[in-house]
Amino acid sequence: NTGGMGAYSPAPVVTSDVHNKVMQQVIQPVVDAMKHAGHPYTGFLYAGLMIDKAGDPYVIEFNCRFGDPETQPILMRLQSSMVDLVAQGLAGQLPSEAKWDARPALGIVVASKGYPYV
C-alpha cells in the first residue's frame, strides 16, 4: 500500500454541490452517529473518497489524522492560522469557514527506485 503519491488543491471535481453532498451524506452523519453513541468527536477526520461521474461520494476510508500527502497542498492554500483553528476546534468554537488562497497548489512525493519494496 503506497498511499498517495501526490495531490493537488483545489480539486475541480469538488464543486459546491459535491462539497454539500459530502458534508450532508458522509461527514455530518458520521459525526452525528459518534455523538449519538456517546462519543462526541473533536479532531481531524480524514475521509478518503471517490466521486463518481454523477458527483456522488463513496467512502474508501476514514482516518483520525490528516491525509498524507493530500493535506500538504491544502495547507499551502490555508490563509487562516492553523494554531488558531486547532485552538478554536478544541474549545468547540470553530468559525464556519477558514480563509483560503485561491491559487492552486501541488504536492508530489519523491520515492526511491523500487519503492515500496526497498
Task: Label each PLM-derived region with a short phrase.
Residues 6, 57-58, 105-108:
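Structural motif
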Residues 1, 47-51, 57-66:
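Short beta-strand elements
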Residues 8-10, 51-52, 76, 111:
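Short beta-strand-to-turn element immediately C-terminal to the catalytic PLP-Schiff-base lysine
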Residues 23-45, 63-118:
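Active-site "cap" helix and flanking loop/linker of ATP-utilizing ligase/carboxylase catalytic domains
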